[in-house]
Amino acid sequence: MFRHVAQNLGSRNTSIQSYRLLRTRWERGYLKDLYHRRQILGADPAISRSSYPNCSVQVRNHHCSADKSTLQWAPIKTSIDNSSDDFAANTAEMKVLVEDLKAKISKIEQAGGEKAVKLHRSRGKMLARERIDGIVDAGSPFIEFSQLAGYEMYGKEEVPSGGILTGVGIVSGRVCVIVANDATVKGGTYYPITVKKHLRAQEIARENKLPCIYLVDSGGANLPRQADIFADSQHFGRIFYNQATMSSEGIPQLAVVMGSCTAGGAYVPAMSDQAIIVKGTGTVFLGGPPLVKAATGEEISAEELGGADLHCGESGVTDYYAHNDKHALYLARSCIAGLPPVEEHMTFNPNADEPLYPAEEIYGIVGSNLKKTYDVREVIARIVDGSRFHEFKERYGETLVTGFATIYGQRVGILANNGVLFAESAMKGSHFIELCCQRKIPLLFLQNITGFMVGRDAEAGGIAKHGAKLVTAVACAKVPKITVLVGGSYGAGNYGMCGRGYSPRYVFMWPNSRISVMGGEQAANVLSTVQKEKKKREGADWTDQQDLELRKPVEEKFEKEGHPYFASARLWDDGVIDPKDTRKVLGLAFQSTLQKPIPETKFGVFRM
């Protein structure tokens, strides 16, 4: 979720607000370090930056100049009456959803609770979010992934954010993936959802060739749940497999040991390219003091067994000796600053034109009622640079809007639902995806889809084969793909519009969205019809009361399981976001895809 942390650092370019305005005024000594490292990086040392500072740092042949060729694209002319009753009602509905989301995020950010936080601080340790704030460039954006991970998944056990924080941010001018254990949540131990979230962060790093920074403070596996954590292919061991293979692919791996690093978790620093450890709090060992005593009878402290002095001076497991958390973060930033420069393969312009219309108007356009229709172009107009949109096949397959735009200077091809998908819509989408792949233009999918058209006429018109063309095109496309659920995501429509199963680089959801194999009402209708036919064959009655008793639990189940909180808790997405922050989210998300060359796309057989 997009959130701000108050910061008074002088004048700022507020054209692009950050996810979090980073807390940098910890103490004078740290500010001196910050001043010094900004000079090292060739940046203006003044602590007053835009949300995308120093965009050219560590980038070869990259400039932030605007691509003026797109300026001739006509802006979308809005037809929205923001003084209408409908607009006001939609706005009120969406604000309720957004405030509920913010309230849940606020509670989650309290981490393991007041007692656990107090104990954590008493050990001289920074909280996980403070550590992230300390390593990311001052004033730069940070996307925190899946804050709702684990939400209501473990009964009375609360696991805020799944016990681990992950995200993408800019460190020493370089876009990086950050993984930070939260030791205030069950000692930072790994639940099944913790493992899944850690692996998802590594997947994002691999897909986009982003350096990984691990801020380690974990007691290892959650032993009571070991059967769901340890042995399978996508369980705990996969973390280290990913570290090894990513390192072999030239994706930097950096570990900062800031707390416990026990048992299998000890391999996180041991398998990293570089490792930092904090004196007094950071420990690395395969077997802790209790296990050592049980096995050998030796009594030894954690620091003596696996502390900074031992691993920096004797074992060589770690490479850099930090005196405290802040020093460790400074060393980590220095390590990232020492990486070779990268060549970005697309254009990113932090000073691009803002949309002509306020992002807050999205509330009044969309609302919370998925049955209400609206022109999705109005949403596009509040996301893209200058509201400029070069529409493709405007008069054909009108229930799928396709066209070209730029987001912070990066050209993107947009596919946005404007109704049910017909054969013509599917063919249009396939054509457009092929065009973008040939030109190596990233794709943005705005999902609000009930599915493909059904009925005899649709089947006779080849909806199955034409829908398959769209699904094939989406599956085979090698350009970066990002999906935002702005409404419903139902059935095969989810597949045709690049759902999670089709490897988009990122998936984000709005709080009004829903995701299911079909809507609850439709599912109840199907099951009701099946029961009626069955009773009819048996010669039995099917009363209205029986029908109601069947329908109600089905509709309730689908409503619960289709809710964005349910989906995000299980990592079916990368986060539920405030609709008005969509442009900013997409800005950093697309920027993170710039590091990796786009390969050629080869399509399979299209049934004609």
Swiss-Prot record:
Carboxyltransferase subunit of the 3-methylcrotonyl-CoA carboxylase, an enzyme that catalyzes the conversion of 3-methylcrotonyl-CoA to 3-methylglutaconyl-CoA, a critical step for leucine and isovaleric acid catabolism. Residues 1-61 form a transit peptide. Disulfide bonds: none annotated. Belongs to the AccD/PCCB family. Its main location: mitochondrion. The keyword Acyltransferase does not apply. Residues 351-600 form the CoA carboxyltransferase C-terminal domain. Pathway: Amino-acid degradation; L-leucine degradation; (S)-3-hydroxy-3-methylglutaryl-CoA from 3-isovaleryl-CoA: step 2/3. It catalyses: 3-methylbut-2-enoyl-CoA + hydrogencarbonate + ATP = 3-methyl-(2E)-glutaconyl-CoA + ADP + phosphate + H(+). Keywords: ATP-binding, Ligase, Mitochondrion, Nucleotide-binding, Transit peptide. It comes from Caenorhabditis elegans. GO terms for molecular function: ATP binding; methylcrotonoyl-CoA carboxylase activity. GO terms for cellular component: cytoplasm; methylcrotonoyl-CoA carboxylase complex; mitochondrial matrix; mitochondrion. InterPro entries: AcCoA_carboxyl_beta, ClpP/crotonase-like_dom_sf, COA_CT_C, COA_CT_N, MCCB/AccD1-like. Residues 388-417 are annotated as: Acyl-CoA binding. It holds the Pfam family Carboxyl_trans. This is Probable methylcrotonoyl-CoA carboxylase beta chain, mitochondrial. It is found in: Mitochondrion matrix. GO terms for biological process: L-leucine catabolic process. Residues 94-600 are annotated as: Carboxyltransferase. It comes from the Eukaryota. It is an enzyme of class 6 (ligase). The keyword Transit peptide applies. Residues 94-351 form the CoA carboxyltransferase N-terminal domain. Its EC number is 6.4.1.4.
